[in-house]
Amino acid sequence: MRYVLLLKGINVGGRNKVVMAELRRAVADLGYDNVETYINSGNLFFDTDKKPAEIVADFHDFFASHYPFVEAFSLLSAEDYATEVGQLPTWWEEDMARKDVLFYTEGMDKAGLMSYVDSLKLGDEVLQISDRAIYWGKYSESSYQQTAYHKKLAKSPFYKQVTIRNGNTFSALSNYLIP
């Protein structure tokens, strides 16, 4: 089965550097097949017959020994990803200043995040909560500083528990997962 592993917080601002070619080789050496990456932000694709729990355990061990600064990641099968794409909100196709997908990371307090997000008073923005992510759209760049996303969520402890991909990257990931 095809999977994507979305790493949090690598190659950002010159910190937590991971060379994608080295990562691909190391993951292939772990026994994963058809290993690919997309851009430098930690989008790792591979094939395996392993169960998700075994994959998560493998990568927790791998990152602890090779890249200890990688503390969080999200694992989705190609099927999971296709389900997410199939459930995109209608507003996702609208012209917006920003669109982000906040993927839940393995082991995070998902219920706590959902409760927190439900309590936010939204500004010039819209969101949809799904099983594996929160889709967040911001209508205007000029009002971005006033959005709940910027003013509240980005400053909350939950922000460190999600890994974020912008709308363009989210769309591009489909090319590696959905035939």
What residues fall within each predicted segment?
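Surface-exposed, charge/polar-rich loops and edge strands
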Residues: R2-S41, F45-P179
